[in-house]
């Protein structure tokens, strides 16, 4: 009888809000912490977000991962503090203020006033903090908002100063001039890892310019995609080992010089030119040339405009001759510095030409490309002009093109500690594992010195005070600054400390005009969050390195990296032990999620529609937890709800329906007296196997392998155990079998809700609250995570049940393929497979028979005479690989014995001996089919072949009608929302065939539908049905209860 309700009618959003309110009012999170005080500390670092924007799926994903691990560790007995922190400084905040105050021109902030600007930044830092807290609260994540740390707090900033001073004391800090990524929109340098965060495909000019040689009739052909840098050209480089050619135009006689390997790239028609000579690159070194522009002709006397050797020069692109503007290229800078070539930088911090380039003064450099090319064309200096599509770095915050530019900056000597960083990385357990030697390891190998100073305002000021003659003082604490200035210091932002002058040794010292890269703030977070070393030394050191950290893949070049730099430098050890790296959540179309494009649903609407548990499980059970990108689909979340969570809710509803009906008391039964059936022992064995798998996966931080076992178990529970055991729960008498069924399902729910609690905390709490007893703890989240009960684990039973389910699955596939309803009984079902496996399935014959609705089951160790499995070559797969041998393979496959075919199915490969050659075939190389006698159909898996006898007798047809009637009547019971115990009166208007079937199977039909009275009518108002081709009208009503 299929009439129990489908779970609570309470909406998901209402249920989750109810549970959230329960956690809040009863302070369950606080109690979970208090219960573990004094236990082993489990520490993790939580990457601080900016509260100037709303959370997106990436934040919720990383937060969910952290929540799962934190909940599991707590349930596993650890004390897991979960302080939240906020990133308050830097470009994200400043940029928002600039937009709101319309401070768009160079110098606008200074004109507005730095102090006023910084205070405006302070005001908006927590613009969306309430929304952030609500999102985090709504997704079911537990964090402590009562003790948040903020990068703008004086205590945090003082610890950042301490970190900087410690690095300085180790000789790891220096001031220098280098070519670094530079945001002209922000007017500040960026770090190399920031520059790598936002590459785009762009169209840029591709031009080849003629540089006339002095004392030589030829011109060098020089390629560039940045024409604006040509005004700053100081040298060209050639490869000493490269062979160069002199080419003459057959008509004009004009001569050009370029790399021999580049010749075909620029000269496609050999009839238009001739190669006059070839020579090594060394023959060009030292020659002088005429630059494309003469803005800096005076620099020739200082060594400009000569040809230099460059080992970096290649012929894979361009011309083999490289234009060098040392102020705008890293390789250019070092080569020119090595050869004492002067440098010019006629570009200001906003990307505009200075007065040194009067023709373009005040104009943005990229907008001058066209004018520069036009000017060169007018001078006859352009050999080629086209466009090129290539990847180019953009500012990660303003989405404007970056340039590379020489700036004066403060650097951390990362290259000095590279080996320490690599050694630290070896001690970290990364998930997925390939991050260690792959993306993160390779980034560490290529680590460069870190430009940590920014020409900005709202940030932690770099604590360096400098005198006019260049002496410096590096301050490491507030106390030290107060002693040197004689002033009380309460705020460390620049508009306060820049007013402080230090007088020492007869000199005046003023602070340098830079703030820290905000990544330096967050890299110092493990220490600064606790005001270390000024306070909380024991707390900080006991939690270092962190047990766990989790962020997105982009943080391998961001926060993971900056944390590692500082930790390796200060302590020569990793800053965290275990790391989970997630991929990026993209829009469903594969593009980046964009508010402007409106190409994704809001997270809050998803949670209110499908529930936070569904969103959590959708993310956790996807490739995104393996550092792969996920195309977000609300249909995917809906699928998780319908296929996983609702069935689990229905199990609870089923259990509650019958325990309430029959009065099962969880406090009042003796487990020792329960006589468990085989299927009870199977589901309990399966349960504790899942416990072991989840524990093992969580211990190794593999969330994707932790989720799959319990998701699969839900299917095992709902679509096998409950379905197979319904009748046991229906028993009106208090039989040992019914008690065993109740006891089994109660144990499953009590253990399983603890297994799933870290992952889907709402539904686990709902289950727990509805089945807990007076002796239970207040919340499932105050319970211990279960351990595997080895006394209840039976691997052989799990294997046997797995085999039975595999056989049933094959049978159902055949029925579906050949359009044979399961309600249509069939006479015979044959199973072919290994004898040892089939021998163990004798006790499951009845189960298989009932599941497939067949009368008779026969096991064979070899295929019966009426079925033959055939194997043919898959020409599409094999054709290219084996060529003409395909005919020999076809013959060999045709001659395979049934035993050899079974070996292929079992091993999923087969070796064929073709004379002198052996060829290995895999499943994708062959096509499997089955030849059967008329009336039979067959299908195989790796272990079993099943054959279904499809021949229908009159008796089978009549029985099918009776089963169809039961199905339709019980559907009407559900639709009319009858109670599971309601008896009914049944009336029908139907054909003679259906009438006969009903009368023949009346006892069965009445028992299955709780029918106490039935009658037939010639005319009837009711619901119309098709009963296997017989139009039938059925009406039901609740029978009068006896007094």
Curated annotation (Swiss-Prot):
It catalyses: tRNA(Ile) + L-isoleucine + ATP = L-isoleucyl-tRNA(Ile) + AMP + diphosphate. InterPro entries: aa-tRNA-synth_I_CS, aa-tRNA-synth_Ia, Anticodon_Ile_ABEc, Ile-tRNA-ligase, Ile-tRNA-ligase_type2, M/V/L/I-tRNA-synth_anticd-bd, Rossmann-like_a/b/a_fold, tRNAsynth_Ia_anticodon-bd. Keywords: Aminoacyl-tRNA synthetase, ATP-binding, Cytoplasm, Ligase, Metal-binding, Nucleotide-binding, Protein biosynthesis, Zinc. Its cofactor is Zn(2+). A motif ('KMSKS' region) lies at residues 592-596. It is found in: Cytoplasm. CDD domains: Anticodon_Ia_Ile_ABEc, IleRS_core. SUPFAM superfamilies: Anticodon-binding domain of a subclass of class I aminoacyl-tRNA synthetases (SSF47323), Nucleotidylyl transferase (SSF52374), ValRS/IleRS/LeuRS editing domain (SSF50677). ATP binds at residue 595. A motif ('HIGH' region) lies at residues 49-59. PANTHER family: ISOLEUCINE--TRNA LIGASE, CYTOPLASMIC, SOLEUCYL-TRNA SYNTHETASE. Monomer. IleRS has two distinct active sites: one for aminoacylation and one for editing. The misactivated valine is translocated from the active site to the editing site, which sterically excludes the correctly activated isoleucine. The single editing site contains two valyl binding pockets, one specific for each substrate (Val-AMP or Val-tRNA(Ile)). Belongs to the class-I aminoacyl-tRNA synthetase family. IleS type 2 subfamily. This is Isoleucine--tRNA ligase. It comes from Chlamydia abortus (strain DSM 27085 / S26/3). The lineage of its organism: Bacteria, Pseudomonadati, Chlamydiota, Chlamydiia, Chlamydiales. The gene is ileS.
């Amino acid at each position: 009888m299929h009439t129990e309700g489908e779970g609570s009618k309470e909406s998901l959003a209402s249920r989750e809000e109810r549970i959230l309110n329960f956690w809040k009012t009863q302070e369950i999170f606080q109690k979970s912490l208090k219960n573990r005080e004094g236990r082993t500390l489990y520490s993790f670092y939580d990457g601080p977000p900016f509260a100037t924007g709303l959370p997106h799926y990436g934040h919720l994903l990383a937060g969910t991962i952290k929540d799962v691990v934190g909940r599991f560790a707590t349930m596993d007995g650890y004390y897991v503090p979960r302080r939240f922190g906020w990133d308050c400084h830097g470009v994200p905040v400043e940029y928002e203020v600039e937009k709101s105050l319309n401070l768009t021109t160079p110098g606008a902030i200074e004109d507005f006033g730095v102090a006023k600007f910084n205070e405006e930044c302070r005001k908006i830092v927590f613009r969306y903090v309430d929304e952030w807290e609500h999102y985090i609260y709504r997704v079911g994540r537990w964090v402590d908002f009562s003790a948040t740390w903020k990068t703008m707090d004086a205590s945090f900033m003082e610890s950042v100063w301490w970190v900087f001073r410690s690095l300085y004391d180790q000789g790891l800090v220096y001031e220098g001039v280098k070519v670094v990524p530079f945001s002209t929109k922000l007017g500040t340098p960026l770090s190399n890892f920031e520059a790598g965060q936002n590459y785009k495909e762009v169209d840029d000019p591709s031009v080849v310019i003629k540089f006339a040689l002095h004392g030589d009739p030829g011109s060098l052909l020089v390629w560039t995609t940045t024409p604006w840098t040509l005004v700053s050209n100081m040298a060209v480089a050639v490869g000493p080992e490269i062979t160069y050619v002199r080419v003459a135009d057959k008509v004009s006689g004009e001569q050009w010089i370029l790399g021999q390997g580049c010749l075909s790239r620029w000269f496609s028609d050999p009839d238009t030119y001739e190669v006059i000579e070839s020579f090594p690159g060394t023959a060009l070194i030292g020659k002088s040339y005429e630059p494309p522009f003469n803005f800096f002709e005076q620099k020739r006397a200082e060594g400009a405009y000569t040809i230099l050797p460059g080992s970096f020069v290649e012929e894979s692109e361009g011309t083999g001759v490289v234009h060098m503007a040392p102020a705008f290229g890293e390789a250019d800078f070092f080569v020119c510095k090595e050869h004492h070539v002067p440098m010019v930088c006629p570009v200001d911090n906003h990307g505009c030409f200075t007065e040194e380039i009067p023709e373009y003064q005040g104009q943005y450099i990229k907008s001058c490309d066209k004018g520069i090319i036009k000017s060169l064309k007018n001078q006859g200096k352009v050999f080629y002009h086209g466009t090129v599509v290539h990847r180019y770095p953009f500012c990660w915050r303003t989405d404007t093109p970056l340039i590379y530019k020489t700036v004066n900056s403060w650097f951390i000597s990362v290259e000095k500690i590279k080996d320490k960083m690599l050694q630290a990385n070896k001690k970290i357990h990364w998930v997925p594992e390939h991050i260690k030697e792959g993306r993160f390891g390779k980034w560490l190998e290529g680590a460069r010195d870190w430009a940590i100073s920014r020409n900005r305002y709202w940030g932690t000021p770099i604590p360096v005070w400098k005198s006019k003659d260049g002496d410096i003082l590096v301050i490491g604490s507030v106390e030290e600054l107060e002693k040197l200035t004689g002033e009380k210091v309460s705020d460390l932002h620049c508009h306060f400390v820049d007013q402080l002058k230090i007088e020492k040794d007869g000199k005046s010292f003023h602070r340098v005009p830079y703030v820290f890269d905000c990544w330096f703030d967050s890299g110092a977070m493990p220490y600064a969050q606790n005001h270390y070393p000024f306070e909380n030394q024991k707390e900080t050191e006991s939690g270092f390195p962190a047990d766990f950290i989790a962020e997105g893949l982009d943080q391998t070049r961001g926060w993971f990296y900056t944390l590692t730099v500082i930790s390796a430098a200060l302590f020569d050890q990793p800053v965290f032990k275990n790391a989970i790296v997630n991929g990026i959540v993209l829009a469903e179309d594969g593009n980046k999620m964009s508010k402007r494009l409106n190409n994704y649903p809001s997270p809050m609407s998803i949670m209110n529609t499908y529930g936070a548990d569904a969103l959590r499980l959708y993310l956790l059970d996807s490739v995104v937890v393996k550092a792969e990108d996920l195309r977000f689909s609300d249909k995917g979340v809906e699928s998780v709800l319908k296929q996983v969570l609702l069935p689990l809710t229905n199990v609870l509803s089923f259990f509650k329906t019958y325990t309430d009906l029959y009065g099962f008391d969880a406090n009042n039964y003796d487990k020792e007296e329960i006589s468990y059936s085989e299927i009870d022992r199977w589901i309990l064995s399966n349960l504790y196997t899942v416990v072991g798998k989840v524990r093992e996966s969580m211990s190794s931080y593999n969330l994707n392998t932790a989720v799959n076992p319990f998701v699969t178990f839900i299917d095992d529970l709902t679509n096998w155990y409950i379905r197979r055991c319904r009748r046991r729960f229906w028993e009106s008498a208090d039989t040992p079998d019914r008690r065993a069924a109740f006891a089994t399902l109660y144990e499953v729910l009590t253990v399983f809700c603890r297994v799933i609690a870290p992952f889907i905390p709402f539904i686990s709490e709902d289950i727990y609250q509805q089945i807990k007893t007076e002796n239970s703890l207040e919340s499932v989240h105050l319970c211990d995570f279960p351990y595997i009960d080895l006394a209840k684990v039976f691997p052989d039973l799990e294997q046997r049940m797995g085999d039975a389910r595999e056989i049933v699955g094959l049978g159902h596939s055949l029925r579906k393929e050949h359009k044979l309803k399961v309600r249509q009984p069939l006479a015979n079902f044959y199973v072919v497979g290994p004898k040892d496996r089939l021998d163990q399935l004798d006790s499951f014959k009845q189960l298989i028979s009932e599941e497939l609705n067949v009368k008779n089951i026969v096991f064979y160790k070899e295929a019966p005479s009426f079925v033959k499995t055939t194997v043919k070559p898959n020409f599409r797969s094999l054709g290219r690989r084996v060529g003409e041998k395909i005919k020999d393979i076809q013959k060999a496959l045709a001659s395979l014995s049934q035993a050899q075919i079974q070996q292929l199915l079992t091993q999923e490969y087969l070796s064929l001996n073709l004379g002198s050659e052996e060829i290995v075939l895999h499943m994708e190389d062959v096509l499997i089919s089955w030849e059967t006698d008329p009336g039979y159909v067959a299908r195989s898996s790796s272990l079993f072949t099943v054959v279904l006898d499809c021949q229908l007798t009159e008796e089978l047809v009549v029985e099918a009608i009776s089963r169809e009637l039961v199905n339709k009547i019980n559907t009407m019971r559900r639709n009319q929302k009858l109670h599971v115990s309601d008896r009914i009166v049944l009336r029908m208007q139907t054909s003679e065939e259906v009438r006969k079937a009903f009368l023949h199977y009346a006892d069965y039909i009445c028992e299955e539908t709780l029918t106490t009275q039935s009658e037939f009518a010639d005319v009837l108002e009711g619901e119309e049905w098709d009963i296997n081709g017989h139009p039938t009208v059925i009406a039901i009503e609740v029978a009068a209860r006896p007094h």
